[in-house]
Design a protein with these regions (language model features):
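Short, structurally constrained coil/turn elements
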Residues: 47, 122, 148, 202-204, ...
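Mid-domain alpha/beta scaffold segments of enzyme catalytic cores
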Residues: 39, 46-172, 176-180, 299
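Active-site micro-motifs of SAM-dependent methyltransferase domains
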Residues: 60-62, 215, 247, 282, ...
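Catalytic pocket-lining loop regions of alpha/beta-barrel enzymes
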Residues: 153, 164-275, 284, 325
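Mid-to-C-terminal alpha-helical segments outside catalytic/metal-binding sites
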Residues: 3-4, 9, 14-39, 45-56, ...
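A short, hydrophobic/aromatic-rich structural module that often spans a beta strand
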Residues: 102-121, 208-209, 257-264, 288-297, ...
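Active-site metal-binding loops of divalent metal-dependent hydrolases
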Residues: 58, 104, 213, 279-280
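Short beta-strand segments
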Residues: 100-103, 131, 241-244, 275-277, ...
Length: 326
């Protein structure tokens, strides 16, 4: 589906002059400065600062498996990849200022200690998103503790053992998240669209980010999934996480087979309800691209105008995860 025929945003996307390749490369090579002091607050950015870029989707892996034990058969990144040090190196190289660390369930499952401890230890550049068991009655209280005592600003939501996203256990967690003013990250495929829509309507004040846009990918299911995303965009409290291009593409970088789909989603949701994430560590989750190449798809390949890039790469995410609403 080509969004060029829909006008409006598609036309402005072709104007790249306001954010040139030279400017971006200058930012990327110069890096950035972040405060590592414990308890420091993420301040508002000055006008003269480099463009605000926030990575909304990074999985982090601890090196101390005695303190932070893994599940029985963890999905491991290559040696030396996925650590916080590696993440900081990638961020600095690309000019990324802040990051949202998503609980690495394929490594720790429900044990959120490493994500929570890392977020609390690095408040100058990181917030955490936990994942809790919807079938465990203790989970709502655990969520409140993570938010109050750690630097957790969101919860990743998955279906319960019943197979349903609108299970009572899930709903209780959403109710708690809504009261706490944090964000829900919904990790579901298109078969859960109706359940996702129902829950979102039931919690109108809860901001819900659709991880990987229902896992959109090239192939026979692309158009139906894209149609579902466009339909979900009608709900004002739903947001799109545009992380699917390198994970769902059947082509090498710059993964052009999903560019039109991405533009269509941006047009449907608007830049103020779209965010970018790297899928860090890319060596594990999207090995066809590097960290900087994934960012480069949005700064150089999609033809986005400056205002659209500013929202998708920074200001929308800052409003969601780095500004407390409760």
């Amino acid at each position: 589906m080509n969004c060029d025929s829909k006008g409006g945003l598609a036309q402005t996307m072709t104007n790249r002059s306001a954010f040139t390749r030279r400017k971006f490369m200058t930012i990327s090579t110069a890096g950035f400065a972040v405060s590592m002091a414990k308890g420091s607050k993420i301040a508002s950015q000055e006008r003269d600062d480099p463009p605000l870029i926030i990575d909304c989707h990074a999985h982090i892996y601890g090196e101390d498996e005695t303190r932070y034990p893994t599940i029985a058969k963890p999905y491991r990144p290559p040696n030396g990849k996925g650590t916080i040090q590696h993440l900081q190196q990638e961020m600095q190289s690309a000019g990324v200022r802040y990051v949202t660390a998503i609980q690495t369930s394929s490594y720790y499952r429900w044990d959120n200690r490493f994500t929570a401890d890392s977020a609390r230890a690095n408040p100058g550049f990181m917030v955490g998103v936990c994942t809790l068991d919807p079938d465990d009655p203790r989970s709502p209280d655990q969520l409140e503790d993570y938010v109050q005592e750690y630097h957790i600003r969101g919860m990743r939501s998955i279906p319960a053992k019943s197979g349903r996203l609108d299970d009572p256990g899930v709903d209780k967690l959403w109710t708690t998240a809504e009261r706490l003013g944090i964000v829900i990250n919904a990790l579901v495929d298109r078969d859960k669209r109706a359940e996702l829509e129902g829950l979102a309507r039931r919690h109108p004040k809860l901001r819900v980010v659709i991880d990987h846009c229902l896992n959109l990918k090239a192939g026979p299911a692309m158009e139906p999934t894209l149609s579902d995303m466009v339909a979900l965009a009608k709900l004002p409290n739903l947001y799109a996480k545009l992380t699917f291009i390198p994970t769902g593409s059947a082509e090498p970088f710059p993964c052009r087979d999903l560019h039109d789909a991405c533009r269509t989603i941006i047009q449907a949701f608007g830049p103020d309800r779209c965010v970018w994430g790297s899928d860090f560590p890319c060596e594990l989750w999207c090995p066809k691209v590097t960290y900087r190449q994934h960012l480069g798809i949005f700064t150089h390949e999609l033809g986005l105008d400056q205002g659209t890039m500013k929202a998708i790469l920074g200001t929308t995410a800052h409003r969601l995860w780095f500004t407390r609403s409760a």
